[in-house]
Regions:
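Terminal, low-structured helical/coil segments at or just beyond the last alpha-helical repeat
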Residues: 1-3, 194-234
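Residue-level recognition of tetratricopeptide repeat
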Residues: 11, 44-46, 80, 114, ...
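TPR alpha-solenoid repeat register
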Residues: 38-39, 74, 108, 142, ...
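Structural signature of tandem alpha-helical TPR/SEL1-like repeats
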Residues: 15-24, 49-63, 85-97, 119-131, ...
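A conserved position within tetratricopeptide repeats
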Residues: 30-31, 65, 99, 133, ...
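TPR/TPR-like (Sel1-like) alpha-helical repeat modules
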Residues: 168, 174, 178, 182-208
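Canonical tetratricopeptide repeat
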Residues: 41-42, 77, 111, 145, ...
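Short coil turns that delineate tetratricopeptide repeat
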Residues: 33-34, 69, 103, 137, ...
Length: 234
């Protein structure tokens, strides 16, 4: 059976043994003679496999929520997985229903805010964050969500201000600091972005989280190289 037939079977049936059989055949053929059609076919095989894996992950997160309704983590993973499947509207619909059923629940505002963000509906994310903040004005999660919404709407200074406030309220969650680092780079404020990455490294090192420093160190090295290149061009 050739790679094209295996790819067609895997697309139609989603059976793992067809993926396992097709993958090395594609890799061998590409190594022998790189070809645009082979690369496209192999890419699509991997993409299809990724979608199937994500669908399994969705089922696991949904089951985890059933088993432990008070754990927030699987909710956020579920929202992210739906976005990865290009189905963010399904997460939005779910958490709109949940909030409607529990309009005084702060966590439901948080979930729905994140769902709107993954759907790139920044206006609604901003609205839901502000609505939740009427219940708890100093909720770090919703302030961070509001920051993400502002960033999506082009309000960089408002986003940075919200993320700084979120970090002040909850120093043990540095997600807002990562968001700041990326936004500052997009705004071409590379020195400030580098400072944010250094702060992330320092935060992890202070907690003996060595592995967690590897990625921010790579980001910092990349920024330093870009800054050095700019200096050399002057």
């Amino acid at each position: 059976m050739d790679v094209n037939e295996l790819l067609a079977r895997y697309e139609a049936r989603g059976q793992e043994h067809d993926f396992v059989a097709a993958k090395p055949l594609f890799e061998r053929a590409i190594a022998e003679a790189e070809d645009a059609r082979l690369l496209t076919g192999y890419g699509y095989l991997l993409e299809s496999h990724g979608r199937n894996e994500l669908r399994q992950a969705v089922g696991l997160y949904e089951r985890a929520i059933e088993l432990d309704p008070d754990d927030d983590k699987p909710h956020y993973h579920l929202i992210g997985a739906r976005a990865g499947l290009r189905e963010p509207e399904r997460a939005v619909a779910l958490y709109e229903q949940r909030l409607a059923a529990s309009p005084e629940s702060l966590r439901e505002y948080r979930f729905l805010g994140h769902a709107y963000l993954t759907a790139h509906d920044y206006t609604r994310a901003l609205e839901i964050a502000e609505a939740g903040l009427t219940l708890a004005p100093d909720d770090a999660v919703l302030i961070a969500v509001r920051g993400e919404a502002k960033a999506g709407l082009g309000d960089a200074e408002g986003a940075l201000s919200d993320w700084a406030r979120a970090l002040e309220l909850d120093p043990e969650d540095i997600g807002a600091l990562s968001s700041s680092a990326f936004l500052l780079e997009r705004e071409n404020r590379l020195e400030e972005s580098a400072a944010a990455w250094q702060a992330i490294i320092d935060w992890n090192q202070a907690r003996s989280q060595t592995l967690e420093t590897e990625w921010p160190k790579r980001e910092l090295e990349r920024l330093h190289a870009e800054l050095a290149g700019r200096t050399g061009d002057q």
